[in-house]
């Protein structure tokens, strides 16, 4: 294929996509492991619980990377941050089990205070090199009106970690520890307003809700009375976009388009 022959962007763009190993319409094809980055202990279940359940049921290994301890997620002034963090980690383990997830890496940074630093980026890179996933999922840092800095930082740190995980001179201590560089096919953004891929979760919606509700510290009865319809409405929104009853939306971006790409939004 000689790209000099193309005279317009659409032809060249289509040809470029065909050269990639990653296919947008079959993002999990031939993927054996997925790493799902979450800022707080309930985010993977809330954002992608249905997708995760379907992936694990199909034999794909899903691993969580939890960035903060969740110690701020309460309105109860009688509960200490330390006590809440311990409780939330146990809730996360039970929730993950419902969805078929067997491993959780917890970095234990402070809730609401996830640092946007090289050190956090290095820790994420180390986990990527340990787990060697085919795809990494993370919150979309460009979601309009997202008010939580942990979510924005998690997305940006995840993108940067994916970009650097394949570079041997980045965090060379990993090499000394026997962790080889690892390049990622693509990233997928959940909590996104611009999905380009949908998963029909109509048949596992109740399982997803059960996994979310397992985070009992976050969803007591009075809170769940609002959050259950909220989560159903989000799933119906993605379902409306994709022709399903309930769906989850993900925006996939091939790794090469994460740098100097003016048309990544076109994908």
Curated annotation (Swiss-Prot):
Pathway(s) it belongs to: Glycan degradation; chitin degradation
Gene Ontology annotations of biological process type: chitin catabolic process; polysaccharide catabolic process
Recorded coiled-coil stretches: none
Top-level enzyme category: hydrolase
Cysteine disulfide partners in this protein: none
Entries under Pfam families matching the protein: PIG-L
Regulation: induction: By diacetylchitobiose (GlcNAc2).
A GO term for molecular function: hydrolase activity, acting on carbon-nitrogen (but not peptide) bonds, in linear amides
pH dependence: Optimum pH is 8.5.
EC number(s) from the headed UniProt entry: 3.5.1.136
Keywords, sorted A to Z: Carbohydrate metabolism, Chitin degradation, Cytoplasm, Hydrolase, Polysaccharide degradation
Compartments, record wording: Cytoplasm
Catalytic temperature dependence: Optimum temperature is 75 degrees Celsius. Activity levels at 37 and 100 degrees Celsius are 20% of that observed at the optimal temperature.
Function: Deacylates the non-reducing end of diacetylchitobiose (GlcNAc2). Can also use N-acetylglucosamine (GlcNAc) and N-acetylchitotriose (GlcNAc3). Probably involved in chitin degradation.
Subunit structure, as described in the record: Homohexamer.
Family as reported in the entry's similarity comment: Belongs to the PIGL family.
Name assigned to this protein: Diacetylchitobiose deacetylase
């Amino acid at each position: 294929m000689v790209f000099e022959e193309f005279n317009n962007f659409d032809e060249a763009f289509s040809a470029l996509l065909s050269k990639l190993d990653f296919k947008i319409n079959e993002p999990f094809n031939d993927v054996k492991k997925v790493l799902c980055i979450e800022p707080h202990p309930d985010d993977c279940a809330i954002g992608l619980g249905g997708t995760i359940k379907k992936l694990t049921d199909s034999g794909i290994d899903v691993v969580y990377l939890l960035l903060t301890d969740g110690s701020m997620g309460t309105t109860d002034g009688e509960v200490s941050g330390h006590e809440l963090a311990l409780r939330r980690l146990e809730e996360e383990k039970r929730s993950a089990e419902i969805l078929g997830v067997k491993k959780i890496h917890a970095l234990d940074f402070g809730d609401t205070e996830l640092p946007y630093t090289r050190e956090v980026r290095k820790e994420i890179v180390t986990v990527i090199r340990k787990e060697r996933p085919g795809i990494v999922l993370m919150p979309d840092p460009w979601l309009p009106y997202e008010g939580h800095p942990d979510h924005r930082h998690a997305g940006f740190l995840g993108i940067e970690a994916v970009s650097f995980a394949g570079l041997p001179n980045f965090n060379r201590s990993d090499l000394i520890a026997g962790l080889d560089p690892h390049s990622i096919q693509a990233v997928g953004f959940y909590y996104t307003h611009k999905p380009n891929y949908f998963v029909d979760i109509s048949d596992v919606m109740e399982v997803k809700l059960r996994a979310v509700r397992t985070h009992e510290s976050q969803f007591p009865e009075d809170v769940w009375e609002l959050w259950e319809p909220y989560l159903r409405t989000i799933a119906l929104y993605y379902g409306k976009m994709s022709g399903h009853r309930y769906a989850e939306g993900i925006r996939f971006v091939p790794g090469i388009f994460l740098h100097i790409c003016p048309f990544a939004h076109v994908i």
